[in-house]
Amino acid sequence: MKERKVIIKTGLNLENSYTSLPEIFFTRQSPSCIPSPKLAVLNYPLITSLGLNAQVLQSADGVDILAGNKIPEEAIPIAQAYAGHQFGHFTMLGDGRALLLGEHITPLGDRFDIQLKGSGKTPYSRGGDGKAALGPMLREYIISEAMNALGIPTTRSLAVVTTGESIMREAELPGAILTRVAASHIRVGTFEYVSRWGTVEELRALANYTLQRHFKKGYDKENPYLFLLQEVIEKQAELIAKWQLVGFVHGVMNTDNMTISGETIDYGPCAFMDVYDPETVFSSIDIYGRYAYGNQPNIATWNLARFAETLLPLLHINPNEAIKIAENAVSDFTKLYKNNWLSGMRAKLGIFNEELEDEYLIEDLLSIMHKYGADYTNTFRALTFDNIEDTVLFDKMEFDKWYKLWQERLTRQEEAKLSSKQLMKSSNPSVIPRNHRVEEALEAAVKEGDYSVMEKLLDALSKPYDHSKEQDYYSKLPEPSTCPYQTYCGT
């Protein structure tokens, strides 16, 4: 690897504090060499926020770094080890096709993981080729950037490069590498891994590292590991509520895809719901609906219980006391989630203050939407219109009854009607990454090499709360189909 190390002024300021952990947590590994990398897409706003050099990154040397052909001098590429419950079944995992180059320290002192996804085989590849296809990498780029614009914590996509290789999946597909940026890649599955195969001291080392990386206030607490558990529960309660509020279906909420930082990660089989239905499932492998839209809060609770189990040796010297502490902490999730969800739903309806009856008002609207197969995003968007009478949402009599109750509710707050409208417009996106529009962009890019469709889509998705006429095209529903939209993990 030494001959591939280079000094190129990309602006990357890399450290790798993760390698200070015991070696059970990672394996040092070089990326595979790529025959003819070409830049497909580069995230200029993210480059600016990270303090990187766009001109160098889009040069031949920069593209070689994004492809893994050249390695920044200060980088220590590693594949991270972790485990996870996949559809409820525990298994050993790890980075099977990704390498962490290091942690970039921004000019403001913030720390972000820089990871190459699709960079070749690792000791954790489990028989896979370690490669990634262009379509799924572009899809992650689109969805993660849309999530960021919606204000939802997420990993980001810095770039996608094509590799010049063909890889075999369901067919022969063009290869690609995505550069992912994350607060960290520490997962519930990382803790599960060390809990199963490591020592208590190695578990403590990971917990202490996580506190130092994400929750420094925990050091001053009487029980820092309880603080760690509570903070992760709070972050996940906020995150899952935000997913539900925009109709996002993750599709593969395995414990290895739940981050400790509270960011959304892994955009393989995800999609946004069109017609409101709590049983919405997009993933082709989720045949029993374990990860359906309406079940996401329950699965989050289940995942957090698995996280709490890993911390038992650190929570209390007495195992029975440790279990009680963990159970009490996890039981808080439901209330925390519901408070976040209700607060977000009130905002979507222009409600500033709290009343006990609000939940009934919200549930009544959702029930009507479900009954009439209404589009989730466009229904809330229509409620922001001044002339809502011109928009036929459901059965007129049923909707009029609900609408009257809603208008009466708005009178029981001090804020003016204009303020309510502004709150609604800032809480209800006019555009989301509609599945048919995403597929349209991917088909043009992958099959025709035309990235203009994707660029226009990304531009619209970058301003989801603008409510402009230009976004009307992206808010239109797909044509009715007898075949439901399905997603695939892309691996």
From Swiss-Prot:
One MF term in the entry's GO annotations: AMPylase activity
InterPro entries in the record: SelO (IPR003846)
Name of the protein described by the UniProt record: Protein nucleotidyltransferase YdiU
Intrachain disulfide bonds: none
Similarity comment: Belongs to the SELO family.
Binding-site positions, ATP: G94, G96, R97, K117, D129, G130, R180, R187, D266
Cofactor field: Mg(2+); Mn(2+)
